[in-house]
Amino acid sequence: MKQKILVLGGPTAVGKTELSIKLAEKLNGEILSADSMQIYKKMDIGSAKVTKEEMRDINHHMIDIVSPEEEFSVADFKNIGEKAIKEIIAKEKLPMIVGGTGLYINSLTCNVTFTESEKDDEYRTYLESLAEANGNNYVHEMLREIDEISYRDIHPNNRKRVIRALEVYKISGKPFSSYNAGNDFYKTDYHVFYYVLTMDREKLYDRINKRVDIMIENGLIDECIELKKLGYTSSMQSMQGIGYKEILYYLDKKISLYEAVNLIKQGSRNYAKRQLTWFRRDPRCTFLDKDVLSDKEILSKIVDDITNN
């Protein structure tokens, strides 16, 4: 019998954290965060990082594992995450992958290949200079010409991954997206139970807007001031995260606070839309609509599925 793994995905602000804690308590689980911002130390408010109080003594993995100045790839996440899963299984507990970063989830639950060994430093430097001179959208549009799937899947602000996709195509002549295509993509040693929380779009957007306001009230600006004092700049991968880059623009007097807050809200809403598009393309996902099912019903369904299958 295959080892069970529970995946709980969904867009930002849909309510994954609270449900995941309740599930871990019911199913004797430990949580592995699949969130591309919660990996960073010192970046708590803008990433909506789960607090010690919210954890309620449930072990969490893949949170606060790298410093803001460090580069961190999906391959890095896979390497560390696989070790964490083995540790959880060794304790005879249920591994629970919780988050909204689809690439991170797939790295642990799919037959994913990374092409990190092939590099062209000269071409990469050239692309970096293009992005610096013309903006991230410029190199992102270059990707459209050679790899429509990667163009659609990779956000323009994920400059590192956009450049990697262009680099891989130049080296191999094959689209970056083709490395993980094929019938064996979803083949895994685990029995994956994959659930995605959804709700009415307008309700979700309202929750997102309110959460951004709460982040500002809770000290996001002060958090960014401290990060800036420590020498972290907007050019770093971590500082490209929604909420951080906008406040840094404000602190650099490039935009007003009003503009920064509205950009964070718009960016978060757009991100939620992209997340849902990602999950809808995955045939493994069972969607649980919070407008149709109560929190108690959702909890009960997942617990029953895991327990009885």
UniProtKB/Swiss-Prot annotation:
It catalyses: adenosine(37) in tRNA + dimethylallyl diphosphate = N(6)-dimethylallyladenosine(37) in tRNA + diphosphate. The keyword Ribonucleoprotein does not apply. Keywords: ATP-binding, Magnesium, Nucleotide-binding, Transferase, tRNA processing. The record marks T101, R124 as: Interaction with substrate tRNA. The keyword ATP-binding applies. Its EC number is 2.5.1.75. ATP binds at G10, P11, T12, A13, V14, G15, K16, T17. Residues 35-38 are annotated as: Interaction with substrate tRNA. Its cofactor is Mg(2+). Substrate binds at T12, A13, V14, G15, K16, T17. GO terms for molecular function: ATP binding; tRNA dimethylallyltransferase activity. One of its GO terms (biological process) is tRNA modification. Belongs to the IPP transferase family. Catalyzes the transfer of a dimethylallyl group onto the adenine at position 37 in tRNAs that read codons beginning with uridine, leading to the formation of N6-(dimethylallyl)adenosine (i(6)A). NCBIfam families: miaA. Monomer. HAMAP family: IPP_trans. This is tRNA dimethylallyltransferase. It comes from Clostridium botulinum (strain Eklund 17B / Type B).
